[in-house]
């Protein structure tokens, strides 16, 4: 209800392009457009479908063309409203249209509020893998309203909780135990504080390493295996959070066996994942396809790859391994359906 007040603090123009997830448009589109128009703005809407399929060059091209049709100039403003997909493709459009224009982000899913809306990473996918074309481009503002989460179903809420668990694993033991011990009702009551804690963790890391060359890689805990799973199943079988949950558990399982991780940590991760209905068993996948996806991982450096592990709950570490050793250690044979690595 107060978004125009904040916009006027950072934007003196009148024309706004609203890039919005179509489901969010159905829920809130009329309200936000009416609010903006009543406060003197001219609004043009670009609605996109949710899901990873919209993080494509084809959708990006359609956004560019609509921005041109609307005569959006470099001095105008883009508002991106939706979950992680809308934020990624809408943010990348803002970063590249006319060599970059201002945008603000209104994240509407838990995952977007605690993770993808913070830090300035924007990207689209290629058929070969996730987030292969992208940039670092900071929005002028991110406006987080936990009340927008009331329309999320349980699976989508838990999708976001997977990223909260990630933050707890790499940086905040107290948050981990809070997530493990609080009831569902208590989690709901404390969600604003949980969001703030996660944003604070990420914000501090990003301020130290905006371009992802050092400690920001810690935010990729679970993502190396997780992205493989998402790509392998064409972004259809598992949500992002579910794939990351499987990645966190299995990377820690092997890390504990190898002696990098304190004994018993894998079991604790399993406990908290099960509490939020998140999977942990690695699905059946072909090793050749896994290797192709790993070869494109952005943490690869020549024949090596940076792997994110945890020594203990709240203590993430970066381990540089040869891709050959990593593949042999973590994918020793074709995985069997329903089993861990």
What spans do the regions from the language model cover?
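Short glycine/serine/threonine-rich phosphate/pyrophosphate-binding segments
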Residues: 27, 85-92, 113, 227-228
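Hydrophobic/aromatic beta-strand patches that form the interior of the parallel beta-sheet core
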Residues: 44-46, 79, 104-106, 141-144, ...
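A generic, well-ordered mixed alpha/beta core segment in the N-terminal half of proteins
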Residues: 78-81, 85-99
């Amino acid at each position: 209800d107060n978004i125009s007040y904040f916009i006027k603090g950072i934007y003196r123009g009148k024309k706004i392009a609203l890039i919005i997830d179509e489901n969010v448009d159905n829920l809130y589109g009329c309200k936000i457009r009416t609010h903006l128009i009543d406060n003197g703005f001219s609004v043009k809407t670009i609605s996109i479908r949710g899901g990873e399929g919209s993080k494509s060059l084809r959708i990006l091209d359609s956004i560019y063309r609509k921005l041109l049709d609307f005569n959006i100039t470099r001095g105008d403003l883009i508002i991106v409203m939706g979950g992680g997909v809308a934020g990624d493709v809408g943010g990348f459009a803002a970063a590249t249209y006319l060599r970059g224009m201002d945008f603000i982000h209104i994240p509407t899913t838990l995952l977007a509020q605690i993770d993808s809306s913070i830090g300035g990473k924007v990207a689209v996918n290629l058929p070969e893998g996730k987030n292969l074309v992208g940039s670092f481009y900071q929005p002028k503002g991110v406006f987080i309203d936990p009340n927008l989460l009331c329309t999320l179903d349980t699976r989508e809420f838990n999708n976001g909780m997977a990223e909260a668990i990630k933050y707890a694993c790499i940086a905040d033991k107290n948050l981990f135990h809070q997530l493990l011990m609080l009831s569902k009702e208590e989690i709901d009551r404390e969600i604003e504080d949980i969001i703030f804690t996660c944003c604070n963790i990420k914000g501090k890391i990003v301020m130290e390493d905006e371009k992802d060359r050092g400690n920001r890689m810690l935010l990729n805990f679970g993502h190396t295996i997780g992205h493989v799973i998402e790509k392998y199943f064409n972004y259809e079988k598992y949500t992002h959070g579910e794939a990351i949950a499987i990645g966190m558990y299995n990377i820690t399982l092997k890390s504990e066996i190898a002696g990098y991780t304190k004994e018993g940590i894998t079991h604790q991760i399993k406990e908290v994942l099960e509490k939020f209905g998140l999977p942990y068993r690695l699905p059946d996948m072909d090793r050749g396809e896994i290797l192709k996806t790993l070869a494109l991982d952005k943490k690869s450096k020549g024949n090596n790859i940076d792997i994110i592990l945890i020594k203990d709950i709240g203590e993430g570490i970066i381990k540089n391994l040869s891709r050959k050793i990593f593949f042999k250690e973590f994918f020793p044979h074709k995985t069997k359906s329903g089993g861990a690595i």
